[in-house]
Amino acid sequence: MQRWLNALPYNNEAHGETLRSFRGVVAHGTAHCLEAALSAAVIMEQHHLPPLVLSFESVDLLDHVIFVYRAASGWGSVARSRDPGLHGRRPCYATPRALAQSYFESYIDHTGGIKAYAVVDLRVLGRYDWRLASTNVWKVERLLLDWPHRPLVFSERRVEQLRRRYVAFRQQHEYKPWRYYKGRERWTALPAEYRKRG
């Protein structure tokens, strides 16, 4: 699942905002983070996993959404992003909160930072066709925006340290970092575009 998403070009919405269902992602061959999460949810439902997504709220309003699942070994995720550190995690986290916290360091850039998270079962949408609709599925986005999120509190001093490190790295490189992040052994494989640098 993660390999398939990694192979898709990221949907930068060059021709206007989209929120495509799995059918739309397959038809267009591209996906942004929420489209990838919805696609993963549809596919993994066929393997008897509930369609759960984890929504991050960021201090700069650039939120992120990933598909999450629980295996015998713990909680893991499947994700697509423009940032190398915000892709999938292996199923080794004891709780959804621990999984969410694993994204803390790699979420920090010039302005970003996690402030809250929520796990949402998309079956609450009832008969709304978020899986295979041929049109945009904006109701999913509205659901996530309105859903109560649990706060994640981190040391402001630590946040500023990480932000300074990120800014210093980007001043020297035209690409985004990932090799200096802790816990990379718990990440799933990155898309090829990131592997040779960072």
Model-derived features: where do they sit?
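A structural boundary/capping signal
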Residues: 1-198
